[in-house]
């Protein structure tokens, strides 16, 4: 039959860590098939299932002869060390990939729960979600400097920053307020080593 309206080309956009080749191999676009017969929903499902790094994907028909794959990748906000590798965790608390090398600028999660009511009540996953919530609330400048997010209990979360600075954050509540207060404290006392925003209405700063 006519080559008109048959799939002849595939275009992929939005990939950052994944490669176009990886995405297109999993998508398995049926080149040569009639464009109208391509099951775009099945392709989207397959991509999300096989490539958990993909957060959203739109498969679109690009008339007269193309299929477009528009990918949005998950972004790591925290890393969990596991057997010498690093598990990437996104802003929704989804563990989506394991990598050998820690990506730059993503803090490491240290879960050191005291065998407390907090752990029994919230469990490791609940504590991970709190850490993710805190990481997501950090002001951009602080997030870049954050090396470790340490969770001892639900309301004992702290950050270790570059230059050995420590931030006592407290619980994940009032994150936006704490972020604003922390940014102001750091501006006012750039040489301080310890910042406490666990009670954001009464923050504290000390030299070391």
Curated annotation (Swiss-Prot):
Main location: membrane
Topological relation to the membrane, as annotated: Single-pass type II membrane protein
PROSITE patterns per the UniProt record, alphabetical: POTRA
Domain of life: Bacteria
POTRA domain segment(s): 5-74
Parts of the chain that traverse the membrane: 23-39
Keyword Manganese tagged: no
A Pfam family reported for this protein in Swiss-Prot or TrEMBL: POTRA_1
Intracellular or extracellular location(s): Cell membrane
UniProt GO cellular component terms: plasma membrane
Keywords tagged on the record: Cell cycle, Cell division, Cell membrane, Membrane, Transmembrane, Transmembrane helix
GO BP term (any one): cell division
InterPro entries named in the record: Cell_div_FtsQ/DivIB_C, FtsQ_DivIB, POTRA, POTRA_FtsQ_type
UniProt similarity note: Belongs to the FtsQ/DivIB family. FtsQ subfamily.
Function noted in UniProt: Essential cell division protein.
Protein name: Cell division protein FtsQ
The species this protein was found in: Streptomyces griseus
């Amino acid at each position: 039959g006519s080559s008109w309206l048959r799939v002849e080309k595939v275009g992929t956009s939005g990939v950052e860590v994944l490669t176009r080749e990886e995405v297109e191999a999993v998508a398995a676009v049926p080149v040569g098939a009639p464009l109208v017969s391509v099951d775009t929903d099945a392709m989207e499902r397959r991509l999300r299932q096989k490539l958990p790094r993909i957060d959203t994907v739109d498969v679109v028909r690009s008339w007269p002869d193309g299929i477009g794959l528009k990918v949005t990748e998950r972004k790591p906000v925290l890393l969990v060390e596991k057997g010498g590798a690093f598990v990437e965790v996104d802003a929704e608390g989804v563990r989506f990939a394991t990598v050998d090398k820690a990506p730059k600028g993503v803090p490491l999660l240290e879960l050191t729960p005291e065998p407390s009511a907090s752990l029994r009540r919230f469990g490791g996953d609940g504590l991970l979600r709190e850490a993710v919530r805190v990481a997501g609330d950090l002001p951009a400048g602080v997030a870049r400097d954050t090396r470790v997010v340490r969770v001892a209990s639900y309301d004992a979360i702290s950050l270790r920053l570059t230059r050995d600075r420590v931030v006592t954050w407290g619980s994940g509540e009032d994150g936006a307020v704490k972020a604003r207060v922390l940014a102001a404290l750091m501006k006012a006392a750039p040489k301080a080593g310890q910042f406490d925003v666990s009670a954001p209405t009464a923050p504290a700063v000390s030299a070391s």
